[in-house]
């Protein structure tokens, strides 16, 4: 997330260095993984529908405020995804899969029949009429950075995954192999179809616009990554040094909302104050700046956790939506 967004706002193009290679492969995939993980969390946590709606409202307000300074905000999209999740929480696993397919198909049909460029200034990556009702609905549902159609499919897919026996090694291996094979097959299909003059533009695995092959490739990649992490975590935790590093990462992972907002306000704000959001940085420079910021954020989380159980924004959301500290 930090690698992709820092490079985006710094107006740095991809290069041939290792940092660009890593960032290129994360672009679109990291966001998809986060939404899928949110779905997994929704299944495992099983929040009451009214609590889920209150959390969605909180995220929507924070996200809309964030949109004032960062056009690629994802929080207000998360709010809409969680509203979708509420409608599916008590549905069967088959309904979750049907819902995911339905959101993907609806998004694809909309891309075929509507003009995806409407509202966009691709030179500045700005959305000219977002703050109108028509523009907001179009951006949120159809052609924004992470529109509900089809991106809500990732959340439903994650909810389906959350109902599996994720602690079983057989399930984990199935996730790794199945996800990897589907991702490879989808990329090969994209390479074969992308030259088609009629539908080639929608057969890409790029995240904008999020066509069906992107949804398949990113969803499959996320499943493979999640399965691999679940598989190797017990082995890593057996090593004392790795266990301490994992503990630090777990602490940071519990403060993702805080880190998301902070990487915009503090990270991008610092770069802007230094006059570095003008394309003057090299790809490898913005990569290492991003890595350094992540290290700083992890250190903050570790220090904060010694005094408080939850991150600043996580605690605020809990206080506002549940009345608890």
What kind of feature is each model-predicted range?
Residues 1-325:
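Alpha-helical transmembrane segments and their immediate juxtamembrane cytosolic regions
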């Amino acid at each position: 997330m930090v690698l992709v967004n820092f490079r985006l706002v710094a107006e740095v193009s991809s290069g041939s260095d290792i940092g660009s290679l890593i960032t290129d492969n994360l672009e679109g995939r990291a966001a998809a993984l986060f939404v899928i993980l949110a779905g997994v969390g929704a299944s495992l946590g099983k929040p009451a529908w009214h609590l889920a709606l209150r959390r969605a409202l909180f995220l929507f307000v924070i996200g809309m405020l964030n949109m004032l300074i960062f056009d690629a905000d994802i929080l207000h999209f998360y709010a809409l995804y969680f509203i979708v999740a509420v409608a599916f929480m008590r549905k069967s696993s088959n309904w979750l899969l049907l819902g995911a397919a339905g959101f993907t198909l609806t998004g694809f049909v909309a891309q075929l029949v509507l003009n995806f460029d409407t509202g966009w200034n691709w030179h500045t990556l700005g959305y000219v009429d977002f703050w109108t009702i028509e523009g907001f609905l179009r951006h949120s549902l159809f052609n924004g950075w992470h529109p509900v159609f089809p991106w809500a499919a990732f959340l439903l897919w994650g909810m389906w995954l959350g109902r599996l026996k994720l602690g079983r090694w057989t399930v984990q291996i199935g996730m790794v192999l199945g996800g990897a094979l589907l991702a490879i097959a989808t990329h090969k299909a994209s390479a074969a179809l992308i030259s088609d003059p009629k539908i080639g533009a929608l057969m890409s695995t790029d995240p904008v616009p999020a066509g069906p092959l992107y949804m398949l490739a990113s969803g499959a990649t996320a499943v493979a990554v999640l399965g691999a992490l679940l598989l190797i975590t017990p082995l890593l935790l057996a090593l004392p040094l790795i266990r301490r590093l994992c503990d630090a990462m777990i602490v940071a992972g519990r403060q993702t909302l805080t880190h998301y907002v902070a990487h915009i306000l503090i990270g991008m704000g610092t770069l802007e104050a230094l006059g570095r959001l003008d394309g003057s940085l090299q790809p490898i420079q913005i990569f290492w700046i991003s890595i350094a910021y992540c290290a700083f954020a992890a250190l903050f989380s570790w220090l904060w956790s010694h005094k408080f159980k939850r991150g600043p924004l996580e605690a605020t959301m809990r206080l506002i939506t549940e009345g608890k500290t």
